[in-house]
């Protein structure tokens, strides 16, 4: 099989919130692509041997000379280029055109009118105007606009406020679009990107789950040989897919460590051990470390401190087990492509602000002295799920809602106690069970219960109760960067509330969180 990454499409990132979305759209076409900073060096670029380049949008303005520019040599590379929003503007300025800040800004939907014929947009339309012009509904997000074309370019589309909403130099296969084809609001956006990537760049469309698995297995076997690999198995999607992939590639050379922190979902430990140990035959070392974690968390209420303690304690437990295994040479991790991109961005961005520390960042201690194996580091989350299904993992496991690494520790808004964890575990399980029963689970992106450290008066029979409050949270999102609270049916919420209050000892009241992101985050801590 040919190397799937032999001639990738490159996306040069100017800081757009949509850059990863561009890459995901390209991958959906079966095309391998990678994201690099806009100032990629020439030698690295040549080694990658790309089939074409997309210049992303960004928050800066090209009217300031100090702001980011594409490498000038890029425009002499003879490769097809597509500039989106800021990418189009910097292309225009660097090739001799002009861009000015506009008082007529465009944010949101706009009607786009196509001009004549262009290879990029021909025969792509939402409807036709009275004069026969093709019209598209697109998503705009810009203040600056191109006011003068570079030499050799022509206008290929316009909006009411942007006479040059798209430009093309067909002879050099250079294109610019002021709108965002990568977002779903641009109805024909995927077709436009496909026209550039597949038809103009002639990109290979072999990036499929089957081929990804074949190439990953070959690479794992080549790297590892006959040596043994250690994996921390959590039961989450990423580590589960890594376990299944490694098991197929190297069989009994894989050893997994599963740490029960006492902060997992109801019956989660049993499910993981049954699925991977008994059914798949993977060697798993199970460690019940509940007491160790609860002792470490005693008296701690600060969310950030809880995260750090849970991460540190996990490393201690994992390290202790790893030291007992003398013949292990490799450590496998479930790093995925967004982790790689975000780590690179944070390392070069002095202005980055840590909202919450990530439990995976920092890794395991150097004393392990193991070589690192990251077999899914080039995959987005949706690709990880597709690979998981192809490897035979159950749909319910692969499409399970996200669960934070610190587990219930950051869903208990107080000191973490066993009593609180047991209450929350049962309440959460009822909520998830009823979502499945009502066929709502896969219609929302994430749902969970939160334990609130306040007591509320309730009435049971003839007696009064003074017990804890549970809050339910359900959100809908595409990328988890923003989210809407789910408008679940009132009768459904009433049923869940009734079950929790009646079946979970210690709960007298259930509430529902109707906060979006922003301003709230999805998790409470």
From Swiss-Prot:
ATP binds at residues 234-240. GO terms for molecular function: ATP binding; GMP synthase activity. Residues 207-400 form the GMPS ATP-PPase domain. PROSITE patterns: GATASE_TYPE_1 (PS51273), GMPS_ATP_PPASE (PS51553). Residues 8-206 form the Glutamine amidotransferase type-1 domain. It is an enzyme of class 6 (ligase). It catalyses: XMP + L-glutamine + ATP + H2O = GMP + L-glutamate + AMP + diphosphate + 2 H(+). CDD domains: GATase1_GMP_Synthase (cd01742), GMP_synthase_C (cd01997). The active site is at 85 (nucleophile), 180, 182. It comes from the Bacteria. Its EC number is 6.3.5.2. Pathway: Purine metabolism; GMP biosynthesis; GMP from XMP (L-Gln route): step 1/1. SUPFAM superfamilies: Adenine nucleotide alpha hydrolases-like, Class I glutamine amidotransferase-like, GMP synthetase C-terminal dimerisation domain. GO terms for cellular component: cytosol. Keywords: ATP-binding, Glutamine amidotransferase, GMP biosynthesis, Ligase, Nucleotide-binding, Purine biosynthesis. PANTHER family: GMP SYNTHASE [GLUTAMINE-HYDROLYZING], GMP SYNTHASE-RELATED. Catalyzes the synthesis of GMP from XMP. Homodimer. This is GMP synthase [glutamine-hydrolyzing].
